[in-house]
From Swiss-Prot:
Name of the coding gene: rplF
Function summary: This protein binds to the 23S rRNA, and is important in its secondary structure. It is located near the subunit interface in the base of the L7/L12 stalk, and near the tRNA binding site of the peptidyltransferase center.
GO molecular function, one term: rRNA binding
InterPro entries, per database record: Ribosomal_uL6-like, Ribosomal_uL6-like_a/b-dom_sf, Ribosomal_uL6_a/b-dom, Ribosomal_uL6_bac-type, Ribosomal_uL6_CS
Subunit structure, as described in the record: Part of the 50S ribosomal subunit.
GO cellular component, one term: cytosolic large ribosomal subunit
Name of this chain's protein: Large ribosomal subunit protein uL6
Length: 177
């Protein structure tokens, strides 16, 4: 039995949810999100809660059960509170700035990188060494953060590069004479 899947998703005040077959749509103060649940699970709206249950006891249904519940929960949190991912830039001359619909990054290459900001995502650079990515879709916020980090991942000797806030970088010692 899935410990996560058996918990119903509570819908807070100010958020409306609609379930039509396998399609779930959630609307809140920050926007609207849609999700289509896999056929292995059934989704039901019970008052101010959304309950997810497996249609059978096979392995695929049990695997999709907890995942579907978590995705529905992330939809509800996204439209009510939103999601944020912070990145830190470390290195001499490494910096970021938002210019219009682009994030300009100087990451030690011979050229600056212009990263286009997609619709539905807000990117801010409160300091030249900090980038904040916010949005209502947890998957998209994490994906954009991963794409920016992949432009210059932190290296293990000096820690230069783009890393998630709070991420531990395994450090190595330089070669000895």
């Amino acid at each position: 039995m899935s410990r996560i899947g058996k918990k119903p998703v509570v819908i807070p005040a100010g958020v409306t949810a609609k379930v039509e077959g396998q399609a779930i749509s959630v609307k809140g103060g920050k926007g609207e999100l849609h999700f289509t649940a896999p056929d292995y699970v059934s989704v039901a709206l019970e008052g101010t809660q959304i309950a997810v249950s497996p249609r059978s006891e096979d392995k695929k249904a049990r695997a999709a059960w907890g995942m579907t519940r978590s995705i529905v929960n992330n939809l509800v949190i996204g439209v009510s509170q939103g999601f944020e991912r912070k990145l830190e830039i470390t290195g001499v001359g490494y910096k970021a700035a938002v210019q219009g619909k682009n994030l300009q990054l100087s990451l030690g290459y011979s050229h600056d990188i212009s990263f286009p900001i997609p619709d539905g995502i807000a990117i801010a650079a409160p300091k030249p060494t900090e980038v904040s990515i916010t949005g209502i879709d947890k998957q998209r916020v994490g994906q954009i953060a991963a794409e920016i980090r992949a432009l210059r991942p932190p290296e293990p000797y000096k820690g230069k590069g783009v890393k998630y806030a709070g991420e531990f970088i395994f450090r190595k010692e330089g070669k000895k004479k």
